[in-house]
Every structure is written in structure tokens, then in C-alpha cells.
Amino acid sequence: MKWLGLLGLVALSECLVTIPLMKVKSMRENLRENDILLDYLEKHPYRPTYKLLSGQQDPDVSFEPLRNYLDLAYIGIISIGTPPQEFKVVLDTGSADLWVPSIYCSSPACGKHNTFNPLLSSTFLVSGRPINIVYGSGRMSGFLAYDTVQIAGLVDVAQAFGLSLQEPGKFMEYAVFDGILGLSYPSLSFEGITPVFDNLWAQGLISQNLFAFYLSSKEERGSMLMLGGVDPSYYSGDLHWVPVSRPLYWQLAVDRISMNGEAIGCDSGCQGIVDTGTSLLIGPRDPVLNIQKIINAQHSHGGEYIIDCDTISTLPDIIFTIDGVDYPVPASAYIRKSSVHGCYSNFDESAAHESEPYEVWVLGDVFLRLYFTVFDRANNRIGLAPAV
């Protein structure tokens, strides 16, 4: 049996391609420091499932309701075109499309980011097809194009991607990243588009139809996206495999959520979305408000919940029970220390809609920094193990 386990690790690590990730200051932190966070929160309430459950009324619009940009904190470097033009992108399991700003973008935010110039690429092809992607924070409008995308030395030929002509809101000016590279299922992408990861697999550029994230909590660098394999040195113990419950997002069934031995949400089971595109733990209003009360978090005029930093060591873990296995998240993880204003709760409430058929939680970077995560497309499952 030990040999079988060893062979499994060797198989998972075969032909591994790694992409270093940089941890950057999130837009939330930038907005807070510029005293406009409350304005953002009032204009863009977080609603993770409403648009999908209510249906996509416009076939020419791709809805990405999970994405509100606010807490995206890990970025990687890709290039597009021949010769290559470089971009900082969020590698995001909560969306499926690739887009970057174009030189034709009229939004003020585009002036503060790298923009793609089609005139400089000999491999560029334009489709002429408009593209509109609705996020939690507004609409990205632009046009669809094709070009060579390079990621960690892998050359993805004729990749479809969006070029923005307009980006949502003045808040994007405070984003450190240029664009988004989605890693969710193709069913979430703009209609008919094959996502980057699917093209890498189809073109034989990776040896296995899976990828994995290691998000370091200790330093700016050290985080990693692994394509086509898994490096077992980044986790301890064995991977626990959980089936994807709905192959749209990377979604799984959660048995229970508890603190101090008592259920605080998900009493009859619920759904969890594993999302590298947010830093927070996000759930329905009532259980999240209950958590804020348990940890004695006080609502601030800035729209967030403040906690006395001296109490962190006394606060309980929150435990997510998934497929019979407990995944504790300690207070040191669910409370963040700000360089400016003390300590804040990393719990946030979704603007849930009464038509939603089930309770949904989003397990963001707070969770993923603790648990190495494998996204296995071949078997529609997620692997979890304690990160080292």
C-alpha cells in the first residue's frame, strides 16, 4: 500500500509546471486607505449566486457574479501576442474568461494598467464580436480576439480572450492587477469560448487535467499555481478528495459549519465555492452576523467589522466539515491586521436573494492559505490537505 501511495504521488507530480504568484495589497486595503471603501460597499453589495439562479437573460452577456474584484490579492504574470506583451493577472477559480485592457479602453482605470496593443502583435486576430462580462462591481465591455498566450513557458496558440474598451467603475483604478485569467469550468465562460486551462490540456501542453494552488501566508512571494501536476512537498498528510457538486464553479457540499462545538450555519448541509478570487469567508447574512457577534466584532462607519487585536488568541476556530473531515480555521487566519486601522474580521455577508435554493458559502484565501488545494478536472473533484 505504501508503494501505491508513492506511485500516486509520482504520477501527480509528473511534468509539473509551476507559476510563481505574488501577494499584493488588495483593492479593499487601497480603498480603505483612501477613505472610499464605504462608498464602494454601498454601491456593490456582494451577491454570489443571484444572477446565475435567475438565469442569463442576455445570451451576449457573461455573468460572473462572484467577481467583485475587492479582495483579489494573488497575481501571476502572463504574456499575450508576438512579440509578447506582459500582464499581471489574477488567476481566478471563480471565473472562466481571460481579459486584459486594450489600448482602445476609455476608462480612467486603463490608463493606470498595462494595455494590449494589437498593432504590435503579428499573431493577433480580431473576431469583431463584442463581449460583455458582468461582475459584482459592474460591467466590462470590449471585444473578442485571438492571440498567442504564454504562461510559465507554455505557449497557448490562438487563445480567445477579451480586450476591454470600458472597465467597471472608478474603483478599478485602485487594482494592482491588469486583468483576469479564469480557471473555472467552460460552462461559466463567455458563450463558446474555450478557457486557457482547457486549451493547455487540449493542445497537450500539460500532462494531467488538473491544477493546484499553494497560497503562502508568510511572505509576499512563495505562493504557487501548479499546472498539470502536484508537488507533495507543499502539503502534509494525504489529499482528501471531495466530488464537485456542481461543475460550474469549483463547488462542493459542506456538511456543517461550527464554532465552540455548536453549528453556526449550514445546519442541514450547504454548498461551498472554493475561490482563489476572494480573500474572505463569505456566507448568508444571518450566520455571518452571528459569527461577528461571537467574536465580538464591532461594525464600523467604514462598513467593515473591527476587532480588538488583543483578543485574537482567545477566539474560537471556525470549523468547516466537508465530506466528514473537519477543516478548522483559527482566529489568526480569519482576522486580518491592517497596517493602518488595527484588526478586521475576514467574514463578509453575501447579499442573498430569497429565490436561492440553498445556502452558499465562499471559501476564499483565508481558507486556501491553510489548505493546499487541487482542482481535478479529469475527475471533477477537489483535493484538500494541510498546507506546509
UniProtKB/Swiss-Prot annotation:
- Tell me which PANTHER family the record gives: BETA-SITE APP-CLEAVING ENZYME, ISOFORM A-RELATED, PEPSIN A-5
Among Gene3D superfamilies, the record links this protein to:
6.10.140.60, Acid Proteases
Q: Which organism is it from?
A: Oryctolagus cuniculus
Q: Which InterPro entries match?
A: Aspartic_peptidase_A1, Aspartic_peptidase_AS, Aspartic_peptidase_N, PEPTIDASE_A1, Peptidase_aspartic_dom_sf
Task: List keywords of the entry alphabetically.
Answer: Aspartyl protease, Digestion, Disulfide bond, Hydrolase, Protease, Secreted, Signal, Zymogen
**Name this polypeptide is given:** Pepsin F
Reaction(s) the record says it catalyses: Preferential cleavage: hydrophobic, preferably aromatic, residues in P1 and P1' positions. Cleaves 1-Phe-|-Val-2, 4-Gln-|-His-5, 13-Glu-|-Ala-14, 14-Ala-|-Leu-15, 15-Leu-|-Tyr-16, 16-Tyr-|-Leu-17, 23-Gly-|-Phe-24, 24-Phe-|-Phe-25 and 25-Phe-|-Tyr-26 bonds in the B chain of insulin
- Residues forming the Peptidase A1 domain are 74-385
From the record, give the cysteines joined by S-S bonds.
Answer: 105-110, 266-270, 309-343
